[in-house]
């Protein structure tokens, strides 16, 4: 038998074996999981979409999670959480999620991390054990602390560099042609612009203009999302097998990031070693997140400082946090601005605001005060988050102890995951007029009517959170980078509208393509295009 014939025969036998054995293996793992590892939910916990007293979800209800999650969440809100009732929902793969009414939120957030853990809940959602190789990157998320404590206090200086990088990225990825219209894939183009701008913040110059580094970051972000979905949907017993397989390509791209970062890392670590760690940073020292990470590690995590793979993985996760949600938000904002322009004159209104507050010179310094005055741009961003938020639940916790009861008498079993619905409240007709219509100035109109009473309308700003508005979470674990995102999205929209004319292709008839649901995630329309031309 020839080698090629043998290989073909082996491949055919392997495929036949796999087609039988893999489903059997998954089924066997499911039975073992149900018998020995499944969480025992209390008998008085109702199941969404099922008759009273039912203890297991039907395939129909599970299928709805994947194909009609928006309606499933709306029914859950109307039938249970709106009425102050706790309920169980099917989730990704074999997961179940306990959904709590908003009236419980204050009590849930009052529990310490050792009882209701935010970090453990996020580890389950993102599956960092397999994407980054260790749970410490979320269990000990000290780079996030640096964003909250150090970077947010230096926003204006940080954003000077990001603004400069945005101009460079727009010119590179969109162009400067003032004569001809150009049609672009919006999501893919904005993703590269934001990766470049975010990299100016995370690693600084020159890596933020290194195409190989930026492409590797892009692929790592996609890999983290894919791993969270696929590994998270896998039965827990099989994750040690499938997790490493699913993340093979992701690990290769993290290695590419490490190789690109290594020269910068070595140079900076050497410079730090020549300084006394107690000294203040040199005035010429880089002012990016990576430098802050190295300085912190020098003082507080010396083992990690000299562990390039670990620092590279922390940087990769920081890039993911800085890019993923912002890309989705800005893509949706641009689609919404263009689609609402015919009714609300959105583009002209926003251009006037930029002219009045920032001025026509794109080199003008952006300040916290100026950003706070841009309430129309702020409203455009908040309305986009209200209607097109990628995440539709918030305030995730894992139950680590027995004995915690909800206000309606449900005991939360140890090991369960709890969260709160977001979208049904953000699209509630009792709160919002015409709730599924995009109204760019919905929030700015309210704020303009009460300009002297800033406190009364402060909860309507883009960065504000509440139990009824959860895109950034709420409470002590709400997104620490949202203040940077506030600067960034306003700078992007300002530069785009002041320097480019934008419109939809003729075949769109002035209407934005519909967003697409992927289970419970709401994604921008794939392949959505806009026509764009540089203004003279």
Swiss-Prot record:
Keywords: Heme, Iron, Membrane, Metal-binding, Monooxygenase, Oxidoreductase, Transmembrane, Transmembrane helix
UniProt main location, coarse: membrane
GO cellular component terms, semicolon-separated: membrane
Pathway(s) served: Secondary metabolite biosynthesis; terpenoid biosynthesis
Membrane spanning residue stretches: 20-39
Biological processes annotated in GO: mycotoxin biosynthetic process
CDD domains, alphabetized: CYP503A1-like (cd11041)
Residues given in the record as heme binding sites: 479
Enzyme type, top EC level: oxidoreductase
EC number: 1.-.-.-
Cleavable signal peptide: none
Cofactor: heme
Uses, biotech or industry: The fungal sesquiterpenoid aspterric acid (AA) is a submicromolar inhibitor of dihydroxy-acid dehydratase (DHAD) in plants and is effective as an herbicide in spray applications.
SUPFAM superfamilies: Cytochrome P450 (SSF48264)
Entry membrane topology: Single-pass membrane protein
UniProt subcellular location: Membrane
InterPro entries associated with the record: Cyt_P450, Cyt_P450_CS, Cyt_P450_E_grp-IV, Cyt_P450_sf
Molecular function per GO: heme binding; iron ion binding; monooxygenase activity; oxidoreductase activity, acting on paired donors, with incorporation or reduction of molecular oxygen
Function per UniProt: Cytochrome P450 monooxygenase; part of the gene cluster that mediates the biosynthesis of the sesquiterpenoid aspterric acid (AA), an inhibitor of dihydroxy-acid dehydratase (DHAD) effective as an herbicide. PbrC catalyzes the third and last step within the pathway and converts the alpha-epoxy carboxylate intermediate produced by the cytochrome P450 monooxygenase pbrB from (-)daucane into the tricyclic aspterric acid.
Similarity remark: Belongs to the cytochrome P450 family.
PANTHER family listed in its UniProt record: CYTOCHROME P450, P450, PUTATIVE (EUROFUNG)-RELATED
Protein known as: Cytochrome P450 monooxygenase pbrC
Organism: Penicillium brasilianum
């Amino acid at each position: 038998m020839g080698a090629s014939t043998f290989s073909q025969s082996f491949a055919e036998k392997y495929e036949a074996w796999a087609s039988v054995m893999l489903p059997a293996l998954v089924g066997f793992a499911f039975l073992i999981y149900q018998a020995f590892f499944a969480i025992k939910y209390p008998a008085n916990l109702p199941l969404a979409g099922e008759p009273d007293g039912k203890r297991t979800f039907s395939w129909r209800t599970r299928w709805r999670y994947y194909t009609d999650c928006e309606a499933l969440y709306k029914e859950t809100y109307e039938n249970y959480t709106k009425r102050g009732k706790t309920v169980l929902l099917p989730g990704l793969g074999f997961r179940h999620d306990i959904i709590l009414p908003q009236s419980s939120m204050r009590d849930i957030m009052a529990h310490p991390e050792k009882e209701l853990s935010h970090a453990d809940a996020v580890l389950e959602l993102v599956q960092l054990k397999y994407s980054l190789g260790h749970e410490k990157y979320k269990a000990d998320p000290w780079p996030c602390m640096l964003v909250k404590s150090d970077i947010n206090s230096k926003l204006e200086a940080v954003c000077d560099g990001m603004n400069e990088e945005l101009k460079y990225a727009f010119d590179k990825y969109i162009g400067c042609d003032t004569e001809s219209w150009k049609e672009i894939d919006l999501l893919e183009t904005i993703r590269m612009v934001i990766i470049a701008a975010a990299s100016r913040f995370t690693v600084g110059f020159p890596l933020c203009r290194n195409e190989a580094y930026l492409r590797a970051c892009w692929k790592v972000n996609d890999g983290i999302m894919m791993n969270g979905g696929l590994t998270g949907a896998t039965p827990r017993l099989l994750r040690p097998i499938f997790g490493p397989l699913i993340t093979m390509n992701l690990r290769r791209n993290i290695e590419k990031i490490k190789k690109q970062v290594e020269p910068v890392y070595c140079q900076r670590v050497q410079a730090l070693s020549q300084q006394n760690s107690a000294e203040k940073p040199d005035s010429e020292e880089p002012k990016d997140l990576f430098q802050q990470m190295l300085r912190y590690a020098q003082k507080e995590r010396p083992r990690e400082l000299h562990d390039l793979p670990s620092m590279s993985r922390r940087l990769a996760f920081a890039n993911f946090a800085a890019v993923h949600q912002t890309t989705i938000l800005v893509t949706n904002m641009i689609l919404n601005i263009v689609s609402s322009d015919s009714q609300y004159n959105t583009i002209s209104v926003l251009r006037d605001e930029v002219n009045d507050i920032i001025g026509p010179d794109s080199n003008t310094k952006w300040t916290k005060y100026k950003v706070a005055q841009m309430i129309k741009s702020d409203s455009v961003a908040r309305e986009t988050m209200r209607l097109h938020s990628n995440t539709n639940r918030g305030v995730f916790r894992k139950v680590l102890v027995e004995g915690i009861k909800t206000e309606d008498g449900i005991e939360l079993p140890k090991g369960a995951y709890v969260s709160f619905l977001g979208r049904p409240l953000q699209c509630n007709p009792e709160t919002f007029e015409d709730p599924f219509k995009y109204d760019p100035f919905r929030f700015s109109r309210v704020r303009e009517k009460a300009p002297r009473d800033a406190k009364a309308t402060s909860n309507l700003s883009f960065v504000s959170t509440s139990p009824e508005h959860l895109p950034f979470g709420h409470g002590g674990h709400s997104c620490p980078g949202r203040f940077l995102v506030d600067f960034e999205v306003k700078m992007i929209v300002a530069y785009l509208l002041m320097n480019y004319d934008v419109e939809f292709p003729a075949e769109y008839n002035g209407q934005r393509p519909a967003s697409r649901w992927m289970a419970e995630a709401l994604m921008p329309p794939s392949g959505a295009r806009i026509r764009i031309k540089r203004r003279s």
